[in-house]
Amino acid sequence: VLSPEDKNNVKAAWSKVGGQAGDYGAEALERMFLSFPTTKTYFPHFDLSHGSAQVKGHGKKVGEALTTAVNHMDDLPGALSTLSDLHAYKLRVDPVNFKLLSHCLLVTLACHNPGEFTPAVHASLDKFLASVSTVLTSKYR
């Protein structure tokens, strides 16, 4: 459960992302594909090269979904229900991949905002991303 301090930390950190959520999402996806090559199997039709339009497009979707989650932290299940259905029933993404992407998102955020990425902010973002992952995998059960 996210504490009020966690929610404030997440909102403050995400505000630094600004209009670059899609870029951060694409960068995190690229990191994931490079660091965890098995994740590429979910994107056989994508050009996974650096800067590809398809990775940027999916990164934008990731960024938009996270922005929605940040704006609806008190109702993540409601805010992410459609996305949860998509990943569970249609795409059938292995739940571990959400943890891998979450890790890559943390690294991306830390690289772009090293001064603001304190241990407390890191912990809050980690809890937030774990909550998002839990919601996205909740319909697998």
From Swiss-Prot:
GO biological process: hydrogen peroxide catabolic process
Keywords assigned by UniProt, alphabetized: Heme, Iron, Metal-binding, Oxygen transport, Transport
Cross-referenced InterPro entries: Globin (IPR000971), Globin-like_sf (IPR009050), Globin/Proto (IPR012292), Hemoglobin_a-typ (IPR002338), Hemoglobin_oxygen_transport (IPR050056), Hemoglobin_pi (IPR002339)
Pfam assignment, any one: Globin
GO cellular component, one term: haptoglobin-hemoglobin complex
Binding, O2: H58
Residues that hold heme b according to the record: H87
Disulfide bonds: none
Signal peptide: none
GO terms, molecular function: haptoglobin binding; heme binding; iron ion binding; organic acid binding; oxygen binding; oxygen carrier activity; peroxidase activity
Ranges where the Globin domain occurs: 1-141
Tissue distribution: Red blood cells.
Subunit (UniProt): Heterotetramer of two alpha chains and two beta chains.
Function: Involved in oxygen transport from the lung to the various peripheral tissues.
Family to which the UniProt record says this protein belongs: Belongs to the globin family.
UniProt name for this protein: Hemoglobin subunit alpha-1
Native organism: Tadarida brasiliensis (Brazilian free-tailed bat)
Upper classification of the organism: Eukaryota, Metazoa, Chordata, Craniata, Vertebrata
